[in-house]
Amino acid sequence: MATSAQLRKQILQGSWDAALAALYGADPAVLQRQRGRYAAALEQFELYFGPGRQVQVYSAPGRAELGGNHTDHQGGYGLAAAVTLDLVAVAARNTDGYVRVKSRGFNKLDVIDLATAEPQAGESTHSASLIRGIAEGFRAVGKQIGGFDAYTASDVLRGSGLSSSAAFEMGMASIWNEEYSTGLTPAELAGICQYAENTYFGKPSGLLDQLTSAVGGIIFADFADPRIPKIEKLHADGLLPEGMFLCVTDTRGSHSELTSEFAAIRQEMEQVAACFGKPLLGQVEENAFWMALPVLRSCCGDRAVLRAIHYFEENARTLAQRDALYAKQFPVFAGLVKQSGQASFALCQNVYCTADVRHQGLSIALALSQRILQGSEGAWRMQGGGFAGTIQAYVPGRLLERYHTAIEQVFGQGSCYVLRLREQGAVRVI
């Protein structure tokens, strides 16, 4: 194992280009940027935790949700892809029983005493709660872990809908899994991370984000048994036909402060399920739901009913998207993407926040996408939890420059990313 200074020198000399190319592609400009990024992270680790320490470097990807918007937490299907935007973590094991994490862009150094397992007052919604919760998740499955020091640098924008939280969680879990040889599978690590986000961080998320970051590629997941989801991995290079590009636009509206809005979607769906004596909509017969519509409107209210309709339709649509990918029928897939986007407006109602109708960045981005892509073979939809954050668009090459320019004229330079998908999940790179 090399020291941080030794690794920095090796990276800048190109000794680790093959490992970097496996994650980010072999484009020389991309490799040059990643060399500089990794070298800077190693330098920052030394600044905060001292020189001469033997370190390892980890990467955990963000994800683009391809289908299954707000279906995973109801025992439904999910479809997502890992992307090359990722979190990089430089880590060294320690022996004092503390975890110390410094993240680029945040002033605070997280210091977690592993002897204190319970959620701490005032810690929820902060990264320290995720670290503490992940540690407890390892212990809950009988794994012995200890402390480490880490510096992280993330290209997954916070609150952007690319799941920066899952990338951070999987980065932390990967460090423990490697440094302490716990031997857990990617799916098991994802479950621990979801537990931390639900129980310690206080966000009632599903499991799709963590699974995608853990496994990589394109994954189709069946959450009928959320404890043991059934996972199919599709090769990422099978998504886009020649000349088609996946763009994600950051509308510069973070949903990091919208936990209550996300929670309401899950709560309302489960309120409808409870009328049938079930905890999740995935356990409710769809025909019975439609037969009970008059009673459900009275008991649960119309928004809850509409969100339940969204669940049933989006779930069927996600299965159809998977089948279209297997059959390499991109036009069918694209049509389903547009249907999903329409459902977010009409049924799930998570494109904008009703408490702040003045700000509707997602709506503007979707309207602009429709104006440019309507009539083409492209498609567009909101992605992620909603209310703010990002949209995605499948853009034909002949329209890419026009689309990119128009989007950035509205949302600013650097707001539109042309994403590359990634086969690898969270991994030790060096």
Which residues does each PLM region occupy?
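Fold-level recognition of mixed alpha/beta catalytic cores in primary-metabolism enzymes, strongest
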Residues: S160-V248, I430
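Phosphate-handling active-site elements
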Residues: A140-F148, I175-I192, G397-V410
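A short glycine/serine-rich beta->alpha loop
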Residues: R53-Q54, H70-Y77, T116-S124, S154-L162, ...
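Structural signature of FAD isoalloxazine-binding scaffolds in flavoprotein oxidoreductases
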Residues: G76-D96, V215
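Glycine- and acidic-rich phosphate- and metal-coordinating loops
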Residues: A135-L157
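Beta-strand segments within the central parallel beta-sheet cores of soluble alpha/beta enzyme folds
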Residues: R100-K102, G147-S154, G183-Y195, A334-Q339, ...
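C-terminal nucleotide
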Residues: M1-R63, G67, V88, A92-S124, ...
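Glycine/serine-rich anion-binding loops at beta->alpha junctions
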Residues: S59-A64, G68-G75, D155-M172, S376-Y394
